[in-house]
Amino acid sequence: MRVTTSFPLGTLRDTPSEAEIISHQLLLKGGYIRRVNSGIYAYMPIMLRVIEKISTIIEKELNNIYCSKLLLPQLHPAELWKKSERWEGYTAGEGIMFNLKDRQGKEFGLAPTHEEVITSIASEMINSYKQLPLCFYQIQTKFRDEIRPRFGLMRSREFIMKDAYSFHSSKEDLASFYEKMEKAYENIFKNCGLDTVGVDADSGAIGGAASKEFMVTADAGEDSILFTESGSYAANIEKAVSLPSKEIPLIRSHEEWIETPNQKSIVDICQNNNLDASQIIKVVIFLAKFEDKSEVPILACIRGDQNINEVKLFNLINKKYISNLIHLKIVDDNAIINKNLINFPLGFIGPDINDETIKINSSWDKSWIRIADYSASSLSIFVSGGNKVDFHKVFRAFSFIEKKFLISDIRNAKKGDCISQESNEELKEKRGIEIGHIFQLGQKYSEKLNAKFSDKNGQLKNLWMGCYGIGVTRIAQAAIEQNHDENGISWPIQISPFEILIIPTNLKDPIQKELTQEIYEEFISNQIDVLLDDRDDRAGVKFKDADLIGIPFQIIIGRDSINKEVEFFSRSSKSKIKIASKNLLEKFISESKVMYNKNS
């Protein structure tokens, strides 16, 4: 292709102010995307080639495990999502689904995911175990009503995604296919030239028994990954489990009151009372809002030197109670004032606080849901709130508290924790960008949408399901996070918009022009993915743009063209050699083969 006739470049000289991270900056500066509105981007021709190459890699691997490609509607009727009991959670409050009503007043949503639609289709087309297993996939645009779109294509309102859905006759068959998909994902990311790590993950709003995320390690990542150096364990921080450090024993012979004027924080209490944070149980109050409109106060206890993992807490509450949990929020001073909770001792609450403290409130449930992390429930002697302002007290043991607690892991694992009693391996931490997620959904959706099949004995059974997502546009941006320098992008060759860029420095020179045409035609005839920068512009501008857009190899045609010689430049290694034009194709094939093998 030629820049002047079929592939215009839209590079920028200045970095757009809204771009916070380097990959977003380079996508905009390189002319790959154009901002239309907050979180909404146009994919320019050069970006579309990257997307198409990623999509081709994905399709090849999925076709290898007998997945069938289809295209599902983006506009979903609300009744399907109400059957799965996800409509309220996805549309109310801080829900992420764009939703609307048509002129008949019927409700619809713009799809962030397609479990409901594909399950509805499966319920109509799958009748017998003889049709199973089946897997369908699509690559298309998804929508999320992000509260704060940021980081370009990392967190946008509109994005391209591959989502696949599998149907099975048994839990064992689902698990077997899940492993095949996991291997396919590893191949996909390797063939995209990415350095990824698979981690145990929370299933979130999608649900299911097991899930795994695939992360590109990068400083700009929004997710924290905890892992061991040996590679024996890796998990997203939302899912990670570990053992906290040992507490420092508190030496007190009996229960006693401690006056703590204006000492609401753990730091203040420790500094003023010669205590260590591990000797304190902090109590955090949450308000849980359920789909049935009920509001239930949550009393969560954890050791003072640890932090509550709100994802673990949310999932625990959601599993234990019948109605779907929609929202979980920390109760602060403003909430107490708004609810007119008189003399509510926020900041001084202990695990033994009575239900009477909340019975005055008309909208809240009249009793606490009490939850304690293992780090709190295992303490023998500790300090916690005294349930009256400016006072804490010493407790003899958590087990002596005459209240019913749900004991579970609601703690944030962190760097430096040991992974188990049997191992001294400590957790390390790094940042990651999620580019893929696979789930064993089980029968969650088939039960609610009545998707059944007839087994070998003629009995009707619910289908077993899996779902598998890849962020196509995220892969493109994540690849830039891993492959750039001070001059611009340095694409892995597998997903680069072109394999090689020809840069004539002066096309007004007839010798350069003739040699340029010869080289271009030779590469085209050998089916090399080549771009010719035939703009009537200064050589310096072309060189700067070439480094910015990041095509792996450059052929620079200059004054030595009179001797049929050119320069061959590798963008990643920055090596440049002078070479006879007759040897150029052979050189490119050799160098590109090395790069393909290195990145796959």
UniProtKB/Swiss-Prot annotation:
What GO biological process terms does the UniProt entry carry, in alphabetical order? prolyl-tRNA aminoacylation
Keyword Aminoacyl-tRNA synthetase found? yes
- The organism sits in which domain of life? Bacteria
**What GO terms are given for molecular function?**
aminoacyl-tRNA deacylase activity; ATP binding; proline-tRNA ligase activity
Q: Which keywords does this Swiss-Prot/TrEMBL entry list? A: Aminoacyl-tRNA synthetase, ATP-binding, Cytoplasm, Ligase, Nucleotide-binding, Protein biosynthesis
Where it sits in the cell: the answer is:
Cytoplasm
Q: Which GO terms describe its cellular component?
A: cytosol
Q: What SUPFAM superfamilies does the record point to? A: Class II aaRS ABD-related, Class II aaRS and biotin synthetases, YbaK/ProRS associated domain
Supply the CDD domains for this chain. Answer: ProRS-INS (cd04334)
Q: What is recorded about the protein's domains?
A: Consists of three domains: the N-terminal catalytic domain, the editing domain and the C-terminal anticodon-binding domain.
Primary role: Catalyzes the attachment of proline to tRNA(Pro) in a two-step reaction: proline is first activated by ATP to form Pro-AMP and then transferred to the acceptor end of tRNA(Pro). As ProRS can inadvertently accommodate and process non-cognate amino acids such as alanine and cysteine, to avoid such errors it has two additional distinct editing activities against alanine. One activity is designated as 'pretransfer' editing and involves the tRNA(Pro)-independent hydrolysis of activated Ala-AMP.
Q: What family classification does the UniProt entry report for this protein? A: Belongs to the class-II aminoacyl-tRNA synthetase family. ProS type 1 subfamily.
- Describe its assembly: Homodimer.
Q: What is this protein called?
A: Proline--tRNA ligase
Record lineage: Bacteria, Bacillati, Cyanobacteriota, Cyanophyceae, Synechococcales
Q: Which gene encodes it?
A: proS
